[in-house]
Design a protein with these regions (language model features):
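Class I SAM-dependent methyltransferase SAM/SAH-binding core
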Residues: 46-99
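A short SAM/SAH-binding and catalytic strip from SAM-dependent methyltransferases
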Residues: 108-126
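A generic alpha-to-beta junction signature in SAM-dependent methyltransferases
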Residues: 38-39, 84, 139-142
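A short glycine-rich, Lys/Arg-flanked "PGG" loop and its adjoining helix->strand segment in the class I
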Residues: 126-142
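Conserved Class I SAM-dependent methyltransferase catalytic core
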Residues: 145-146
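N-terminal, positively charged/glycine-rich alpha-helical extensions of SAM-dependent methyltransferases
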Residues: 1-20, 24-28
Length: 146
């Protein structure tokens, strides 16, 4: 079984990755829930563990442009930067969800489609999930979508 809790697994996965992959749900299936939050199109959105998913691109095309995408994998971030160089408002950064480099109360919405699951597969899983949730709570001023 893959070690989803190991950052090296993700680096290797995206090194050899072709195309894109959406964990669990795509944007279209979550769109009704997101729209019920009544966020403005100018909302600041944090996409945790973006991988190479088209989720942020679909959200961008729906009018949400202020999306900060993070992932622990440099390879994933490079893929996404290359794919989205024309979407200037979106940012892509290598970052650990347990140590977010954002100011307090920065985001209106945080989206996590499976990063928490990956942390639960690693060593010190409950401690790592607690660190992630504490960091997300710190940077979030609005709603949270798991």
């Amino acid at each position: 079984m893959p070690n989803y809790g190991d950052p090296k697994y993700w680096e290797d996965r995206y090194k050899n990755s072709k195309g894109s992959f959406d964990w669990l749900e795509d944007y279209q299936s979550l769109k009704p829930t997101i729209l019920k939050l009544n966020l403005s199109k100018e909302a600041n959105i944090l996409n945790l563990g973006c991988g190479n998913s088209p989720f942020c691109e679909d959200m961008y095309e729906d009018g949400f442009h202020n999306i900060s995408n993070i992932d622990i994998s440099n390879n994933a971030i490079e893929i996404m930067k290359n794919r989205n160089e024309k979407r200037k408002e979106m940012t892509f950064e290598v970052m650990d969800v347990r140590n977010l480099k954002f100011n307090n109360l920065t985001f209106d919405l945080a989206v996590d489609k499976s990063t928490i699951d990956a942390l639960l597969c690693g060593n010190s899983s409950y401690l790592n999930v607690a660190k992630m949730l504490k960091e997300v709570q710190r940077v979030l001023k609005g709603n949270f979508l798991l």
